[in-house]
Amino acid sequence: MNSWRDNVRKVEPYTPGEQPKEEGVIKLNTNENPYPPSDKIKQAMSGIKNLRKYPDPAATKLVEAIASYHGFDKEEVFVGVGSDDVLAVAFMTFFNGKKAIFFPDITYSFYPVWAELFGIPYEKKAVNDAFEIQKEDYYVENGGVVFPNPNAPTGAFLSLEVVEDIIQHNQDVVVIVDEAYIDFGGDTAKELTRKYDNVLVVQTYSKSRSLAGLRIGYAIGNKELIKAMNDVKYSYNSYTMNEPSIVLGTAVLEDEEYFQETRNKIIDTREWFQIEMRKIGFSFADSKANFIFATHESVSAKEIFEAAKKAKIYVRYFDQPRINNYLRITIGTRDEMETLLDFLKEFTATK
């Protein structure tokens, strides 16, 4: 009996970063923005009405606002419940062949989860010792390509020349450039979507826009790609975007000054923090994201991770090959990073 268990889908799920509930925590483990959203959010809240009704299935106002902000037509923008939702829809829509899709071995750990969930064959391509993608690995025949730029969890950034080279060698499949962290120092590949009809660029409100709690992500691509994604989305959930996300996601794009101010604060803090971390024995590649991926010359990452957690400082540790002696540290406020730095100086000095 109990034969229903034989029909349960067996998957190894994605493991999200810890969300501590206790007070007084310095939370530097999930790459959230340390600054509050723009005041435009508060002003726009009064415009959230008719919650008893379903939201606009097309999220037209939000799509139009994103399209206008980036200089594209609304038919070239797809929105979803965070970039995870956008990426999942893209996987379902474009990766349906028998050939393996390619992505880096050290990368966003949701990629293999989606591939397994949707029955997509895949191959991981090893990054080099500096955690850089080797473009030549993507020259061979495949069923699609996806990679973050900057990469997560390493922060390594590919130049647009390298990104375009990968695209040029893969014009028969869809190439997804996952730009969750692009606003912290890199050059976006969005303009390449005008040149190549197989390129999809994915971005999010969760990092640079301080709106991780609203879950807003989007993709930019040619109209045919976007229509295909909407067709898939409407086949399982036509109301993915809720009304608050549509209203507030539209409003936040109106405050460019605040966006640039907080973005630059994070970049400045990151550059200062990298200098200070090297002074106390940490090494890492220069990051173009809102985090660094660091290892210490003599103290193990796991030991630092556990001690920091006891001190109510949360960073991210990945217990997996090649990166199990590294910590991913989100860039918080200057005060938060000074507190972490003081802890690290004291802790590593005793080892």
Regions found by a protein language model. Name each.
Residues N198-R278, F282-A285:
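PLP-dependent aminotransferase class I/II
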Residues E161, E306-A311, R316, Q320-K351:
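PLP-dependent enzyme catalytic core of the Aspartate aminotransferase-like
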Residues T93-E116:
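Conserved PLP-anchoring active-site segment centered on the Schiff-base-forming lysine
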Residues A59-A100, S298:
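Phosphate-binding glycine-rich loop
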Residues E123, N128-D183:
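Active-site phosphate-binding strand-loop segment of PLP-dependent enzymes
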Residues I267, K279-A311:
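Conserved PLP-binding catalytic core of the aspartate aminotransferase-like
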Residues M1-K53, E141:
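N-terminal "arm"/small-domain region of PLP-dependent enzymes with the aminotransferase-like
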